[in-house]
Amino acid sequence: PFANGKGFDGCDLAPANTYPVYDGASDDLRTLVADLNACLKANGEKPIKNVKRGKMARLIAHYKSQFNDEPMAVDFSAAGAQAWYEKGRQFYWAKRGQLNFSCADCHVTNSGNSVRGDVLSAGLGHGVGFPVYRTKWSMSGKPWGTTHRRYGGCNKQVRASPFKAQGTEYKALEYYEAIMNTGVPLKVPSQRQ
């Protein structure tokens, strides 16, 4: 509970399987991270600054786990929502970095193949297990990570500069992947190499 005696259950959080949520009034996406921080702030608590790992990742895991087995059902019927979907789609398929890879190069064209001993995951299902406990991250003592932490890591691996977590690019990508996973059930948390 918060210092005021209330908790997250008193906040306007959407079901986990419907995030990100398009907000027509602001023409922006509400991510679970942003909604959790807004709830903290509205109740006199400090927002969590590190939105890529640690406390935020564990909080997301707890909230999303309550919706395990619920199929992804993100609404993108509004015109503004479709524009966000298109931004995410363009990001997913655009080549970037010194290696000139897109998200699709790894997770569509080469899914199932091995890179440096790791099998590349298929794009279908990305996001439904996040946040994740990752073995590689545990070596540094910070094993939990959000989707945006992983996006940043992917960008670095193709030798592109990562974008800001919760920035426009990664929010659009998260939205695109969530819509592409319509019908795929949530399974949180998950473990990755």
Q: What is the predicted role of each segment?
A:
Residues F67-R96:
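Electrostatic cytochrome c docking/interface patches
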